[in-house]
Amino acid sequence: DVVTPGSSVSDWIAITLARCNVPESYSQYLEALQKYVETRYAEDGGLHDVKATEYHRISLVVLSLGGDPTNFGTKPDGTPIDLIADGTYNFGEKELGLQGLNGWIWALIALDASGVEVPEDARYSRQDMIDAIINAQNSDGSFALDKGNGDVDITAMALQALSPYAGRYDREITSALNWLSLEMSDNCTFFYGTSESSESLSQVIMAVTALNWGVGDMVGFVRDGQTMYTALNRFRCENGLYKHQQEDEKPDYLATVQALQALLSIRGQQNGSGYVFAYQGSIFPPQSDNVFVPGGNQAGTEEPVSENQNTNTWLWIGLAAEMVVIAAIVVVVLKRRKKHG
């Protein structure tokens, strides 16, 4: 399943390796993925009638590997397959968020990553997607997959989706950041259930950096001189891959993928290349044009998460090399698995 185009783990690995500029040939993966998509359309009429995130993930794969998700294969009737349209603004007969808030979140991320303009006669507009996310925010600032208590991962993902529109939703974003800060442990980590989770930590790193803040720039996300970057390193195994939980004995592919995306986000914030899914032509702006000031744009906002001028003055020397090494290890492990079945 790890090396099967169209599977969740395989697709996220492909996205991340490509974003890390690992020198692999991705044409075969794209070709196999297109066959998978065409088969699903021929047999089922699409990728999924409830899980819109299937479209979003595969759209990001295609973008990452240099393809066009608006013209990715052919339907049985001979018309082109438009993954962006079918997975976002013209999603099926059921509600885009039927699977949960992540349906709205990743629809907006995929749509903005592609840079596609939404037609006037579309079922959903960009603003519809933004409103669905904003209206789902809990009174404490958090977001949840469904109605209920806040979830760190979903809150962080919502912030990533809203980052291009930060200036319009200062109150909501500041409130979400404050909630995440309160959820952070004394070790600069976040809990998923009863255990510290590297994936949750990675998602928060991506959220903060998408808003053009370094991981050590906000007092609310620093503990006794530790940052989320130093905390993430505690999940790293001796072989360079990352674990889901610190007590795990073996690394986890998705934990490693999300850790790499977090490192990419740190680098993007530092060098101005932007959010991890800021592809050429995307809606996600350059970091220099996307400076979010918590509590600074609207009167009456909650107490802002303040800036610490001293915790992020040093450069992340060797970060790019670190990512390449980790990504290369992933490639080696995958090739060994494929070779030995």
Language model regions located:
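Long, well-ordered core segments of solenoidal/helical folds
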Residues: 1, 25-48, 73-97, 122-144, ...
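An alpha-helical repeat/solenoid feature that recognizes helix-turn-helix modules
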Residues: 2-25, 46-71, 93-126, 139-175, ...
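A broadly structural signal marking compact, well-ordered functional cores
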Residues: 70-73, 322
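Compositionally biased non-globular segments, especially hydrophobic aliphatic-rich helices
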Residues: 205, 302-304, 323, 330
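C-terminal low-complexity, Ser/Thr- and acidic/Pro-rich disordered "stalk" regions positioned immediately N-terminal
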Residues: 274-311
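Intrinsic disorder/low-complexity segments
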Residues: 281, 300, 321, 328-329
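Juxtamembrane/start-of-transmembrane alpha-helix segments at the extracytoplasmic/lumenal side
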Residues: 307-322
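C-terminal membrane-anchoring or membrane-association module
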Residues: 323-341
